[in-house]
């Protein structure tokens, strides 16, 4: 459950470390969950990388602390809120994804992120 002003960790090697959500895309949605696209600002970044501090970027939420209920009745919850920075077409800007990602990304057609992730839960 990500809303504006929420701080997220970055789960890729694009150069950003922390993001702050400033808008949830997709109509009049108040909260973003796993697989939703948000607009965020980079709050912390690694020097000499493509993504700089204070850049406004699009990102896909890949992990949330709020439990997500699946159709089978199982709840899945992660330790942190994390996102992967993507371009306008939905392809990741980094070349690696760190940490596990949720299977719900497959339903939202983010196959490139799924293929880069070391573990899909």
Swiss-Prot record:
Annotated compartments: Plastid, Chloroplast
Stored InterPro entries: Ribosomal_uL14, Ribosomal_uL14_bac-type, Ribosomal_uL14_sf
Pfam families according to UniProt: Ribosomal_L14
Primary location group: plastid
A GO MF label: structural constituent of ribosome
Signal peptide: none
GO terms under cellular component: chloroplast; cytosolic large ribosomal subunit
SUPFAM superfamilies: Ribosomal protein L14
Assigned keywords, A-Z: Chloroplast, Plastid, Ribonucleoprotein, Ribosomal protein, RNA-binding, rRNA-binding
Sequence similarity: Belongs to the universal ribosomal protein uL14 family.
Quaternary structure (record): Part of the 50S ribosomal subunit.
Function description: Binds to 23S rRNA.
Name assigned to this protein: Large ribosomal subunit protein uL14c
Provenance organism: Nephroselmis olivacea (Green alga)
Phylogenetic lineage: Eukaryota, Viridiplantae, Chlorophyta, Nephroselmidophyceae, Nephroselmidales
